[in-house]
Amino acid sequence: MKKKIPEWLRQAQSKWTHRGQKRPSFALEPRAGEESVWDYPRPPAIQPDTRRVVVKIGEQIIADSTKAIRILETASPPTVYIPPNDINFSLLANASGSSLCEWKGAAHYFCLNGRREAIGWSYATPFEGFEAIANYLSFYPAKVECYIDSERVQPQHGGFYGGWVTSEIIGPFKGEPGTGGW
């Protein structure tokens, strides 16, 4: 059964100003081979990614995949979700806390075994339209090493956000100082 988005949340979604149809004047202009986060849509797009994605801490590989999914949302760097078959769950444990994404639904967090700090999250039963990422995991590049085709991913600013910033992604990005209203 599809998990429907509650009406109160649909109303909140309708209030967004930036939806990816028109790049705002403050957005950087992309050059060849670059992607502007201001061209990403809202609601977010789901895009398969066959590049090699590796997540590790020290020498321990947490995830290694060529079957990731990128979520592309206006104003944010892509968030990369990795299928459960490509995750080394022996290194992970459930972490406390949860959050609600207006597009994807209720997220739960996980941490490294023996630690408490969340390093990533997952949606067990995402809202309709995002079923493709059910039980896929995403990681915070600020807390673990994340790579796309051997390029080290930089974390999105703001602490809470989990966007994956690589050399082809340009902004400015939500989470930077002064971006609270985006």
Language-model-derived ranges and their functions:
Residues 1-182:
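Terminal leader/tail segments of proteins
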